[in-house]
């Protein structure tokens, strides 16, 4: 039987999150295997994959020739190649683009729906998992493999773990944690990624932004020293010529409805409102607060006031857990 996603509950901010086990059904896994895997990925993504160790995972972008991202990928070494996690809505088109040059290389690129993606976060997440695995990942060793399972460690917004495993292990983990952990779906993991300032690229925003417009340079996702990759010229120009005028921002506040990916917001200008930005993702938390991830000009005043279009409620800027200073 296929592993069934958990029913949804309103997400909670990291500071108040009880121990929670999540099914990450809005994310999807893909792999590249074969003798040329590393060389092939090195020519396709913004990160320097040749420098990646077995202990690392990182956020990289896969761009078109103009430097616009098809998707961003949470990348790690897997078997004799690599695996990555991205939003399910962009996986198929992203893989189609990635395969375009594969005919000339010894690689196999494929979606992986055999394995299950789970998230564990919240109060004493590490202690709960320590009973189930012999070793857990940490800041020094961010990827751990045990039998059929790969565990990825995340620091922000609070310590959490992403588990890539087979169906049998996923069922075992669910049975073991069911008594002490709340069960939730992808929306809770999405809320944590928004809070952490990790850009969320869904289908509506695929092919729209260069990596720096979503803060990827601040998240260690772009190497400016590696050799050629698709879109490199535009990505480099944005850095060295200051061509990038946008950044990813975190907004919180109230709204009578959740803005959708690809939608704009409105910025208060005196007595008027002016349309601005592009929403990447938004969630409503259990306390009623709305959290929005949006790409806007990178020179916004910190006390700016925003709203969902024509809404009576307002949103304001929250600091991200990393610096954009280069």
From Swiss-Prot:
The keyword tRNA processing applies. Coiled coil: none annotated. GO terms for molecular function: folic acid binding. One of its GO terms (cellular component) is cytoplasm. It is found in: Cytoplasm. GO terms for biological process: iron-sulfur cluster assembly; RNA modification; tRNA processing. InterPro entries: GCV_T_N, GcvT/YgfZ_C, tRNA-modifying_YgfZ, YgfZ/GcvT, YgfZ/GcvT_CS, YgfZ_barrel. Keywords: Cytoplasm, Folate-binding, tRNA processing. SUPFAM superfamilies: Aminomethyltransferase beta-barrel domain (SSF101790), Folate-binding domain (SSF103025). Folate binds at residues 27, 189. It comes from the Bacteria. Belongs to the tRNA-modifying YgfZ family. Folate-binding protein involved in regulating the level of ATP-DnaA and in the modification of some tRNAs. It is probably a key factor in regulatory networks that act via tRNA modification, such as initiation of chromosomal replication. This is tRNA-modifying protein YgfZ.
